[in-house]
Amino acid sequence: MSISETTKIAIPEPREISTVPRFSDRVFRVVVSLGGISSLVILGAIAFFLGIRGFDVLSNTGIKFITQYEWYSAINTDGTAGEQASTFGIGAMLIGTIITALIAVAIGVPISVASALFLNFYAPTAVRGFLVSVIDLMAAFPSILFGLWGFNVLMPGGEYWAKLLHKYLSFVPLFDVSAPVFSRSPFIAGVVLAIMTIPIITSVSREVFAQAPLDRIQAAYALGATRWAMIKAVVIPYGRSGVIGGAMLGLGRAMGETVAVFTVLNIVFQVNWHVLLGAGGNVA
């Protein structure tokens, strides 16, 4: 008789591991669940309210409400009906919103990426902490402050830069104007929106760049790379997706801004492709 036949190995039976959540864990789960559900309910209620209130307009105008450029109300100032029929279209406003938002992103993204790289790899520790606090504080500023600052401080300087762009780049249709009116233009509105989006994009980019793999950074230095060469070869490729995400967040705020844009932009219900001219459309 062999040893294997006489020896029996005791195999333990599988056990079920169960945990009983603590009372604080259950309370936390209920609170978080209620918070998430309430957010969805509020968003659904807003969408339902807008749909109900705008159903008459959408049913009368159809897709023309989005594609049409005219906005005319047949109701006179005294409350009587006019001779022409009312026409409502937000096409020009949508195009103007996209133009100002793209100007803001084109100005804000390079400045934000450069600021994030400076904070992570060039700024001294004491200066870094102070600048990070200032940038985070700017992200919490209400939009009315940016609008008033843009109207009272930025607009005179913005007119000067707009005149320079028109003087040297007027051969580009975007920078050509039919009349020398440079105040309250889409360009100035885009600059104000860029200043508003810079803190958001900078914060996101800084956090992404800080997550770059340390072993790759050290390997780049070990191969003799300079700091800028290391940033180009390691940090920027690693954080490209995060920068794009931050730019999308900034674009979302730029497209959804109202008070600041209304303060510095001369709103007209027509498409203006000349960004230096003091007139432009916007959903605001």
Positions of PLM-derived features:
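Transmembrane alpha-helical segments of polytopic membrane transport and secretion proteins
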Residues: 1-36
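Cytoplasmic-entry segments and transmembrane alpha-helices of multi-pass inner-membrane transporters
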Residues: 29, 111-150
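N-terminal signal-anchor transmembrane alpha helix
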Residues: 35-52
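Membrane-interfacial helix termini and adjacent extracytoplasmic/periplasmic loops
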Residues: 60-91, 146-195, 265-267, 277
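Transmembrane alpha-helix signature in integral membrane proteins
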Residues: 88-118, 247
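Faces of alpha-helical transmembrane segments in polytopic inner-membrane proteins
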Residues: 108-111, 135-143, 180-206, 237, ...
